[in-house]
Amino acid sequence: MKEIFDRRYPVTSFFLLVTALVFLLMLVTTGGNFDRADTLFRFGAMYGPVIRLFPEQVWRLFSAIFVHIGWEHFIVNMLSLYYLGRQVEEIFGSKKFCFLYLLSGMMGNLFVFVFSPKSLAAGASTSLYGLFSAIIILRYATRNPYIQHLGQSYLTLFMVNIIGSVLIPGISLAGHIGGAVGGAFLAVIFPVRGERRMYSASQRLVALVLFVGLAALLLYKGMG
């Protein structure tokens, strides 16, 4: 437990803890039937039709990140977060990593909102794809050999997982692509530890405008 919740990676540890608590609560309160649609909805899964009817439930764009559909879904995503989260949190720093994780997940769920409008979606993979793409983008902008090597490894994993998203039924391709798009923009927006000049101020501003504009457009289209 001490190794998992490492003080050197407080945000990764926090997200692991919150997601585990949500999953445990789902398990306890449903007697094991935690993968039912009504249970997922009650705990905050992404569901476009209810947001259109009740716009105040837009919080589902974030809450869905912490909800998982069954043991396999939960375990795979938590193992991924454990390893990816530590690496990315070390590169960006804890505060920026927190925003990267949450905003990538939000963008992924906005893609679900527009491109899979009737889907009930949940899981941390929208955020995880954002982590993948952020490091892949940095790989082509940095001279840091560690980030270059990590980015190349992430690119291979990213391609394998995207192919899996296409071939395996029940996986939200829209959410994965959306998370990756969000992470790519955020990699430009947020300065990396020790490499603040990787992107110019004007490049960061353009990326910020594009990110906010795309999010607003998707929300508008989804509500329409």
Label each region the model flagged.
Residues 23-30, 112, 116, 138, ...:
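Structural signal for membrane-spanning alpha-helices in multi-pass inner-membrane proteins
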Residues 4-5, 49-56, 147-150:
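Helix-boundary and loop/linker segments of multi-pass membrane transporters
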Residues 88-93, 142-150, 193-202:
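Membrane-interface helix-boundary motifs at transmembrane edges
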